[in-house]
Amino acid sequence: MKIPAQLALITALAASTLSSHADWPQWRGPHRTAVVKDPAHPFTKINADPKNLWQIDVGPGQSSPIIAGDAAVYMDGINGQEVIHVLDLKTGKERWKAQVGPMVEFQNAYGEGPRCTPLVDEDRVYAQSCGGEFRCYSLKDGKQLWAISFEKDFGAKWFGNKNPDPGSKETASRRHGNNGSAAIDGDRIFVPVGSPENGTLIAFNKLTGAKLWAAGSDNTAYSSVVVGTLAGVRQAVHLTGDAMMGVNVATGEILWREIVKTGAKRNVATPVLDGDTVTIASTSIGTIRYRISGKAPEQTIAKAWENKEMKTVIGTPTQSGNLIFTIGPGNKCDLVCLGAEDGTERWKTPGMGDYASITVINDKVFALNSNGELVVAQADGSAFKETGRLQLCAKTWASPAYDNGRFLVKDGSKLTLLTLD
């Protein structure tokens, strides 16, 4: 049936309005870009003494918190289990909690507990454990609606801290956990299952859990799935342990694939989509932008630019307009501004520790480093222009959620809702 142009425009505007809601319902916010506009809160002055609206004790884990409507959602570790919690956003009072899967013991600096950020879509919340247990719950009361196991259902072998083969120099791409977040588009949810035999990326009906298609034969790494339209084709883009691929959301056909070799298969950053381009970063290859062209069923990927010096260990770049804000390289990272059109460095400033989550709100860059220090600067390519700096929390690798002037911040022992203006 042909839709009248006026109706199509109204539908598009309605979808745009819904998607621009101020909530932070998933990893990196409403559009998975870590960029939002909130004219009501220009942050012209940053309060050096933030106001805590509430604060609660939490268990271990580096999973980031999210905000959906009047609910705050987070995951932590309790008594050997990874647990999802839903709270009243206004008061911090718990509404319900549920066990997602057994905790995994890790031998690294990031500690134990969940590492994947939950996802809210309408009246449902989706959670994933490090060990690959994936659950869909009712956001209202915590009733489990459907579930899958990466290993039991799809044969995605869990290596933990071990190498996949005795004596092998290769390391398991998921040895630090199944950390990449799923993504939703329409009635489909795209889950990074990571089974070489049964699908790297698998699409399910988001309401029933019915499998729709499976694509790829790579192990997953730690990168989250992102959905967008590239060269006119709606696709799920996924950075695996070995490559990056674009998958047709409707059919599961792989539209393009590019080998991305990094040490220990450590592909962590979420791909950044901009028009027909995809930007990725890693500790081995630096930062690279690719351009996608052509039509389905087979598209072409070509390198637009690369900055080999801009190596990022576990951070994801954030693009705002024609600027990219990122971190790297090394364990004492700089905050860096790149030009999106050519990848050249515009400016850099030290002091980010070994990680920083970067959020852009209006014309301000908010960089929360691993030591819990928040650095605020103008989103300006001419020079680093700091507008605020304060200690926000203890050591953390979790990204904050933002909603209507409020920040939801999680470290290793506290979850805090606070304001800065």
Where are these regions (language model features)?
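Noncatalytic, solvent-exposed loop/strand surfaces
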Residues: S20-D421
